[in-house]
Amino acid sequence: MNTADDNAKQRLQELIGPDYTLQWIVGHGGMSTVWLADDNVNDREVAVKVLRPEFSDNTEFLSRFRNEARAAENIHSEHVVTTYDYREVADPAGHTFCFIVLEYIRGESLADMLEREGALPEELALDVMEQAAHGLSVIHRMGLVHRDIKPGNMLITANGILKITDFGIAKAAASVPLTRTGMVVGTAQYVSPEQAQGHQVTPASDVYSLGVVGYEMLSGRRPFTGDSSVSVAIAHINEAPPQMPTSVSAQARELIGIALRKDPARRFADGNELARAVSAVRLGNRPPQPHSPAVQATAVAPSPSASTAMLGQVARPTTSVPASPTVLPERQEKRGSGVGLGLLIAAVIAAVIGGIIWAGATGVFSGDSEETTTPETITQTVTPTETTTSEEPTLAPPPVQPTRQPVPTPDETPTRLPTTTQESPTRVSPTPEETDEPGEQTTPGGQPPLSTLPTSLGWQNNQGGTGNQGNPNTTGNPANPGTPGTTGGNGTGNAGGNSPDAADELLMSLDELMNVGGNQ
């Protein structure tokens, strides 16, 4: 950390006060920065999410930041990142300085996991869905709608526990929107049809978004893509999702199909109904229909299962390395070591010894060989991560009966270390099958009627919000990626925001929207 950074950190520390001691930055979001800090009062690590100075005088951003703290402060669930504190102080220039103190989660955001793994095994994907649905059930019982459920705002700890973060655009179901009438806030890839049109959002809107996440986990791709946020949103409004791979069970496909119904009244009503339905599918049953007695009883939070433990093994803590290496946690220094390095060294030594023995046997060093022998080059590519993938070195042991042109035949291949990375599933063209959803009505060109489109669309494409990009074991407090990282993602350590969708705030007029739709 250079002098300028030290000075900036010192000024920030003075504003925060003595209760929290800043360590280093673990995540960045669209409107905030997340620090790992020590809670000196309660003797614990926390994620401190600081609103960026350039937004502190912006009424809309300040309202969102306050809303995030207030919306989450009374939510207590194992599957929701905990908010500990919120403060506003005036800086020397008279500007408002705001920060939220959140639970610091060591782990990884679901967004980072999906980027690395592709599709997840069905049991793991359903485990994630059930845990997330339980978190949503608590949020919905508090009368809130999250409005931005996506992989970047879902953090997974080393124990396989999923936590929802980033309440920056959450709202009470009966309250007025944070933004002006006709404006949409959310992430286009996961937005519900009613939210995309600027209509009233309900808990069923969060169910739809989680259904999109489930589709992505099981299929290895999102149901709708496009060259702009608006084109993706229009697809959510008008198009039926593509068939899922036939490798996914019929029960799981039916579950996702119900969650992705265009009409919110035909979906599961809230997180509780969805949790009950996922539980039934995990037992091998068909999902119960929405609003039926089977899904209206209060869902019981699942006990950690074998799949939960496996999920924790798949989750890989991603750490945002501080500028000064002297403050790195000791456990991070061990990440590059292990059996893999030992096997690599052993393989290289074996190859060298084998080459020497073979050379002696064939007379390469004796001077009586008339041929020029070019030793085989052994190439080993090593990537210092837990999922190291390297080319297997070819070992050339001495042949039993060497000839003048020996051709070494490998007879031993170093054992590869097991890795949690799974092969990308083979794309299987699904056979046509009936869906429970009739074709949606569209206008010519696939565009929704003018009356269904909001005056403008404002997409917050932050796949992780502000997450705490955390240390190993982080769900991040990127894995608090907002709370990124914590509320926004306690993500890779509360950095809920390192995701493919991190990004831009887009405001588009109706004319621009029509142009985009017409050019598709």
Curated annotation (Swiss-Prot):
Any one Gene Ontology MF annotation carried by this entry is: ATP binding
Q: Where is the composition biased (Polar residues)?
A: 416-429, 450-460
Q: Where is the composition biased (Gly residues)?
A: 485-496
Catalytic reaction annotation = L-seryl-[protein] + ATP = O-phospho-L-seryl-[protein] + ADP + H(+); L-threonyl-[protein] + ATP = O-phospho-L-threonyl-[protein] + ADP + H(+)
Q: Which UniProt keywords apply?
A: ATP-binding, Kinase, Nucleotide-binding, Serine/threonine-protein kinase, Transferase
- Biased composition range(s): Pro residues: 395-411
Q: Region entry Disordered: which residue ranges?
A: 315-334, 366-504
Q: Where does ATP bind?
A: V26, G27, H28, G29, G30, M31, S32, T33, V34, K49
> In the UniProt entry, which residues are flagged as the active site?
D148
* Pfam families named in the record: Pkinase
What EC number(s) does this enzyme carry? 2.7.11.1
Residues of the Protein kinase domain: 20-281
List all Low complexity biased stretches: 374-394, 440-449, 469-484
**PROSITE patterns in the record:** PROTEIN_KINASE_ATP, PROTEIN_KINASE_DOM, PROTEIN_KINASE_ST
What the record says about family reads: Belongs to the protein kinase superfamily. Ser/Thr protein kinase family.
- Protein name, per record: Serine/threonine-protein kinases drp72
Which species is this UniProt entry from? Corynebacterium efficiens (strain DSM 44549 / YS-314 / AJ 12310 / JCM 11189 / NBRC 100395)
